[in-house]
Amino acid sequence: IDLIDKSKEVILFVPGAGMDHRVANLFDLNPKLFNKVISIDLPGHGGTPPSNASTIEEYAKFISVCLEELNLTDFHLCGHSMGGLVCMSLASLNRKIFKSVSLFNCQYPLFVGSALLDGSSRNLDGAADFLTKYGIYKMPSIEKPKKAFGIKGSSFYKKTNGKVITPYGFKDIDNPEREIALYDLKKLFNQVSKDILAVDMNACMGFRMDIKDINKLNDINIIIGEKDKLVSQKK
């Protein structure tokens, strides 16, 4: 916070379910106009220890308390998917401290399919597969293997089929190249507690707002990716 240049715009980004501040590092904004994107890890995400927080409202309250302690106001608030719901709750608490509010690939209510709910609690790798299959249109570029295979592990490059190392252990795959390309992205779901994605999914399912609070959410931006199959553009 001490490194913020007050002559430039400030953005606070709230990541989607199961993710943390590492997502904010993916933003590539004009450094002449914007500070580096800020992201506050929710309880149980990234560097923030787990707590009893398990609802969108509790997540929003956590960030609100952090903002008060940091004395951070007059900035742009944006969130992706579940993070968008957290932004809605935050904006209903105190809309005036935000210069703008933007929701990326988020809809309200945000329903989660039973297969994904079950997978997030029983098979984290399967849930990550589901989210990347339907939420990713353009595949990340694949890192070419070198003599030293690095943290990805040589198993990715030595085998064409069979067992490979994933962020959550070993599994059989049919498309090794896709697994390599998505490896860094899927690592974002790897938190201290493997239950956190399930907690987030249930938080999305349970989030509802009073009509009076919804009416406070005027002048917000909603951006839906045309190719994102996890969000319906009709709702």
Predicted regions and their residues:
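Conserved alpha/beta-hydrolase "acid-adjacent" motif
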Residues: K229-K235
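Conserved alpha/beta-hydrolase "nucleophile elbow" surrounding the catalytic nucleophile
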Residues: P15-A17, F75, G79-S81, G225
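Conserved alpha/beta-hydrolase catalytic His-Asp/Glu region
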Residues: V112, L117-N215
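Active-site acidic short loop of glycosyltransferases
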Residues: K6-K8, N71-D74, R95, L217-D219
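Conserved HGGG/HGGXW glycine-rich cap/lid loop of the alpha/beta-hydrolase fold
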Residues: D2-P49
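Conserved acidic catalytic loop of the alpha/beta-hydrolase fold
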Residues: E58-F75
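Short beta-strand/loop motif that positions the catalytic acidic residue
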Residues: K216, I222-I224, D228
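Conserved hydrolase catalytic core segment
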Residues: T73-V112
